[in-house]
């Protein structure tokens, strides 16, 4: 098959500037290209050639202005068998006109079928135009089918994934080495490390973890809570909320570390140095990719019962779900429980890693997408 993968207009692929969708496409495209001819369309970037072939994948970079129109022209010219559009349902009918003989697949990574994103008529036309809608979580699928019942027979969850080769759990030789190196660099030897990775914004709930900290310190005076991220990744300018977090952190300054934007290649070592991973998200999140990263690193996970996040947690096996997600004491209780038992942390962490290896490696994601493509072709 001749397959087109269409990124959004936000960031380029390969993912030289980050982005969940861009990371996703860069990971799965070479694996799909082992069986099919694959072209990835995304916006231009000064660090990327306009057209190049890497790992068997054709990359075409188009002007950000009028990007959708430029993609349509490419589809019309190249005659693809299957077109996979990422996260832009409103584009599908227009692109379909340029490639009427192609099968269209839509992947939905956020609440793109919400009332403020797409009209009823546009949504129905999009659903009629695609053979299948793949979503990153059951939660996102439900946001579509609850409003558009006609999508039920077409909607399927295909979870995202993680590069298993870059994450080394602490019980491996490489993981032990990375753990010691990172702890040494940050001066954290002998600490029990609780890790938060994400944007420092109220909807992500880092303030709740800081409010939970006194109860944790009481039981574990050797705890260190590490926050990785800024207001937005790559933006280290302080806003009022981040200043508030720093004020809260200063009250327990010997137990809190803020690490602003780090290079993606350094992220795995920061997971490996940690003992417990916590996602305190307060909004209905599609399914934060930090969960896959924590599993790959072999960490026990504590996550809030919001959006798709609980879908990858088996209660008591690879982590715990906080149902009273606004309550700092609930987080403190679960964190204390895990910090009190290295045996439990290791048991849950090993289950996490096995889950990642079985279900959330990029090879599995690519296989799941291929089954969708081949079924609909």
Curated annotation (Swiss-Prot):
GO biological process, one term: biosynthetic process
Top-level taxon: Bacteria
Signal peptide limits: none
UniProt keyword list: Glycosyltransferase, Sporulation, Transferase
Molecular function via GO: glycosyltransferase activity
EC number: 2.4.-.-
Class of the enzyme per the UniProt entry, highest EC level: transferase
InterPro entries from the UniProt entry: Glyco_trans_1 (IPR001296), Glyco_trans_4-like_N (IPR028098)
Family statement drawn from the similarity comment of this UniProt entry: Belongs to the glycosyltransferase group 1 family. Glycosyltransferase 4 subfamily.
PANTHER family given in the database record: GLYCOSYLTRANSFERASE (PTHR12526), SPORE COAT PROTEIN SA (PTHR12526:SF638)
Designated name of the protein: Spore coat protein SA
Organism: Bacillus subtilis (strain 168)
């Amino acid at each position: 098959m001749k397959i087109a993968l269409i990124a959004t207009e936000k960031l380029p692929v390969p993912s030289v500037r980050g982005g969940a969708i861009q990371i996703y496409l860069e990971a799965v495209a070479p694996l799909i290209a082992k069986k099919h001819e694959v072209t990835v369309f995304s916006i231009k970037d000064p660090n990327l050639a306009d057209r190049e072939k890497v790992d068997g994948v054709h990359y075409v970079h188009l002007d950000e202005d009028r990007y959708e129109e430029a993609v349509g022209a490419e589809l019309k010219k190249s005659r693809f068998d299957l077109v996979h559009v990422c996260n832009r349902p409103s584009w599908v009918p227009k692109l379909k006109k340029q490639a009427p003989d192609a099968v269209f697949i839509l992947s939905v990574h956020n609440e793109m079928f919400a009332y403020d994103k797409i009209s009823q008529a546009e949504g129905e036309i999009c659903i009629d135009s695609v053979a299948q809608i793949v979503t990153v979580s059951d939660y996102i699928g439900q946001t579509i089918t609850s409003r558009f019942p006609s999508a039920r027979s077409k909607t399927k969850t295909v979870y995202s994934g993680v590069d298993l080769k870059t994450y080394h759990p602490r019980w491996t030789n490489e993981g032990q080495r990375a753990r010691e190196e990172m702890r040494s660099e940050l001066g954290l030897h002998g600490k029990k490390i609780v890790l938060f990775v994400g944007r420092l914004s109220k909807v992500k709930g880092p303030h709740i973890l800081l409010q939970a900290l006194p109860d944790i310190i009481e039981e574990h005076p050797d705890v260190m809570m590490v926050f990785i991220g800024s207001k937005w990744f790559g933006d280290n300018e302080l806003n009022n909320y981040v200043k508030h977090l720093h004020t809260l952190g200063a009250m327990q300054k010997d137990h809190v570390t803020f690490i602003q934007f780090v290079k993606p290649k350094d992220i795995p070592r920061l997971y490996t140095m940690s003992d417990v991973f916590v996602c305190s998200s307060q909004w209905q999140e599609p399914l934060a990719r930090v969960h896959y990263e924590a599993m790959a690193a072999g960490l026990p996970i504590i996550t809030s019962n919001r959006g798709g996040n609980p879908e990858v947690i088996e209660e008591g096996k690879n982590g715990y779900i906080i149902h009273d997600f606004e309550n700092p004491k609930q987080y403190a209780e679960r964190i204390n429980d895990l910090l009190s038992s290295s045996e439990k942390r290791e048991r849950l962490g090993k289950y996490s890693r096995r889950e990642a290896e079985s279900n959330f490696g990029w090879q599995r994601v690519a296989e799941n997408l291929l089954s969708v493509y081949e079924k609909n072709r």
